[in-house]
Amino acid sequence: MFASIWQTRAVGVLIGCLLDVVFGDPKRGHPVALFGRAAAKLEQITYRDGRVAGAVHVGLLVGAVGLLGAALQRLPGRCWPVAATATATWAALGGTSLARTGRQISDLLERDDVEAARRLLPSLCGRDPAQLGGPGLTRAALESVAENTADAQVVPLLWAASSGVPAVLGYRAINTLDSMIGYRSPRYLRFGWAAARLDDWANYVGARATAVLVVICAPVVGGSPRGAVRAWRRDAARHPSPNAGVVEAAFAGALDVRLGGPTRYHHELQIRPTLGDGRSPKVADLRRAVVLSRVVQAGAAVLAVMLVYRRRP
């Protein structure tokens, strides 16, 4: 039915994008949630306060997911490779749920329903919302929308397009493990080291591709491409994450807002450097960030298909 593996992959990636746009994440039985529960169970066996134990934990889980992806991709049938690629891409994407949550938080903040916004924030990021007021919730949500534009949208598409089902499932496993154990808390400082470093590697190229797309797409929301480039070049390296800083700085410059500052997690308070030199973000800026994030995802889908066809022999 399809002339080559490259056409199969391109069609599968596009169908996966469409599934995410139409359905978003399933409320029950999401593969990522199932993986997370399995990882938590395995941690009860593998946990030791050391880097080697953490590397073994990550290697077992990512290796198992990668092997599963390779097996799914090689099952016989003319349509199966397309279905496998589409399903894996859909499972790895989270753009629709990200946008929905960002909009819901902006709606709540616009109505001054701070308590409800606090309850919703943990579904978007790992911040501690208990001490955040409206401005703090707005900044936390905007920063999370920016960072997850890469993690939940652009990077999975690029892995799916470049290397197929094993790679996109492996990427999602790495990213999920980083969100579970990649913290500098007393428990995970050493055990989570491998997950955090592997996530840095897996996102390195994709985060910069995301920033480029932010620059290109900024005018859609009345943003500044020049401001995005300026903030990216000047501020990104000051962020503690080599990848999140790139994307957050580009968003800050594009939207002419100022991000960073005191950032409270459940296990620590971080004083992060300032990204961008604009105003403090308002609820309207959060709405613009959500729209920009969706436009960037569309651009990433186009980029992914171009990448597939560029790799054709």
Curated annotation (Swiss-Prot):
InterPro entries hit by this protein: Cobalamin_biosynth_CobD/CbiB
GO biological process, one term: cobalamin biosynthetic process
GO cellular component, one term: plasma membrane
Annotated compartments: Cell membrane
Sorted UniProt keywords: Cell membrane, Cobalamin biosynthesis, Membrane, Transmembrane, Transmembrane helix
Pathway(s) where this gene product acts: Cofactor biosynthesis; adenosylcobalamin biosynthesis
Membrane topology field: Multi-pass membrane protein
Top-rank taxon: Bacteria
An annotated Gene Ontology molecular function: ABC-type vitamin B12 transporter activity
Coiled coil stretches, renumbered: none
Keyword Transmembrane helix carried by entry: yes
Record carries keyword Ubl conjugation: no
Transmembrane segments: 52-72, 79-99, 154-174, 204-224, 289-309
Biological role: Converts cobyric acid to cobinamide by the addition of aminopropanol on the F carboxylic group.
Family: Belongs to the CobD/CbiB family.
PANTHER family reported in the protein's UniProt record: COBALAMIN BIOSYNTHESIS PROTEIN CBIB
Protein name: Cobalamin biosynthesis protein CobD
Gene field: cobD
